[in-house]
Amino acid sequence: MDIINDIATVQSRCLQARQAGQRIAFVPTMGYLHEGHLSLMREGRKRGDLLVASIFVNPTQFGPKEDLASYPRDLERDAELVREVGVDILFHPTPATMYPNGYKTYVHVEGLTKTLCGESRPGHFRGVTTVVCKLFNIVQPDIALFGRKDFQQLAVLRRMAADLNLPVEVVGLPTVREKDGLAMSSRNVFLSAEERKQALALVDALRQARVAAHHGEHHARRLVGLVRERIGREPDAQIDYIKICDGDTLEGVDRIDANSVLLMAVRIGQTRLIDNNYILEEV
């Protein structure tokens, strides 16, 4: 595996692969990798001849009061993990490489970015779409793999790729969870032991909502109320949002159907967690 820091070298390696008829699979990350990231890379290994991963803590997707400085980083650990799953190229640029002096161009997807995380984190998705568009242009993958835990991000990136005619298939894979059901996240490391217990309220609330839906409760407002009540029992939980939306448009729904997704963002102590599930998915 090669660790590459400069754009030109990555572009050259990927161009050589394409000219040789190879299929390029790409997994972009912000590092501090967990099993969720590694599962994406294993799937990319199956689907591509050349597997490229990137680690870049993207400053443009963090707000002024968010955790950019404290976001966990451990390149040596991450490099060993990606080597073990068969990554061919690990692209690890610096902020100055991605955003040199005088940088002025940003990518913004309208509509899908106004709700959910976009409402509470203004500018976040502009940073996400900008950096992913740049990475797509650098690597020019045939397929890019993302986790469904970041459901809104996945919808936004699919819209961006379609609207800009980017020749890449954006694939979403199911959320990978800890043994107790908590969605894997690099930010879980910030949870204290007590907060970690309270975070399981998200898992329990999702389960309760799905059980209620399977027993015939199809009013979105009532299901959201059930989830809100369950999470509200935890002393350190602060709800950002809980919504049931159409899985394609992210617009709110009154009554659920097979494409309805329950999405939530909850702060446990100082750690912001997100989770989601199709409400009528098997319990």
Swiss-Prot record:
<dbReference type="GO" id="GO:0005524">
    <property type="term" value="F:ATP binding"/>
</dbReference>
<dbReference type="GO" id="GO:0005829">
    <property type="term" value="C:cytosol"/>
</dbReference>
<dbReference type="GO" id="GO:0004592">
    <property type="term" value="F:pantoate-beta-alanine ligase activity"/>
</dbReference>
<feature type="binding site">
    <location>
        <position position="153"/>
    </location>
    <ligand>
        <name>(R)-pantoate</name>
    </ligand>
</feature>
<keyword id="KW-0547">Nucleotide-binding</keyword>
<dbReference type="GO" id="GO:0015940">
    <property type="term" value="P:pantothenate biosynthetic process"/>
</dbReference>
<dbReference type="InterPro" id="IPR003721">
    <property type="entry name" value="Pantoate_ligase"/>
</dbReference>
<keyword id="KW-0566">Pantothenate biosynthesis</keyword>
<feature type="binding site">
    <location>
        <position position="61"/>
    </location>
    <ligand>
        <name>beta-alanine</name>
    </ligand>
</feature>
<dbReference type="InterPro" id="IPR004821">
    <property type="entry name" value="Cyt_trans-like"/>
</dbReference>
<feature type="binding site">
    <location>
        <begin position="147"/>
        <end position="150"/>
    </location>
    <ligand>
        <name>ATP</name>
    </ligand>
</feature>
<comment type="function">
    <text>Catalyzes the condensation of pantoate with beta-alanine in an ATP-dependent reaction via a pantoyl-adenylate intermediate.</text>
</comment>
<feature type="binding site">
    <location>
        <position position="61"/>
    </location>
    <ligand>
        <name>(R)-pantoate</name>
    </ligand>
</feature>
<feature type="binding site">
    <location>
        <position position="176"/>
    </location>
    <ligand>
        <name>ATP</name>
    </ligand>
</feature>
<comment type="subunit">
    <text>Homodimer.</text>
</comment>
<feature type="binding site">
    <location>
        <begin position="184"/>
        <end position="187"/>
    </location>
    <ligand>
        <name>ATP</name>
    </ligand>
</feature>
<comment type="pathway">
    <text>Cofactor biosynthesis; (R)-pantothenate biosynthesis; (R)-pantothenate from (R)-pantoate and beta-alanine: step 1/1.</text>
</comment>
<keyword id="KW-0067">ATP-binding</keyword>
<dbReference type="InterPro" id="IPR014729">
    <property type="entry name" value="Rossmann-like_a/b/a_fold"/>
</dbReference>
<keyword id="KW-0436">Ligase</keyword>
<dbReference type="Pfam" id="PF02569">
    <property type="entry name" value="Pantoate_ligase"/>
</dbReference>
<keyword id="KW-0963">Cytoplasm</keyword>
<dbReference type="InterPro" id="IPR042176">
    <property type="entry name" value="Pantoate_ligase_C"/>
</dbReference>
<feature type="binding site">
    <location>
        <begin position="30"/>
        <end position="37"/>
    </location>
    <ligand>
        <name>ATP</name>
    </ligand>
</feature>
<comment type="similarity">
    <text>Belongs to the pantothenate synthetase family.</text>
</comment>
<feature type="active site" description="Proton donor">
    <location>
        <position position="37"/>
    </location>
</feature>
<protein>
    <recommendedName>
        <fullName>Pantothenate synthetase</fullName>
        <ecNumber>6.3.2.1</ecNumber>
    </recommendedName>
</protein>
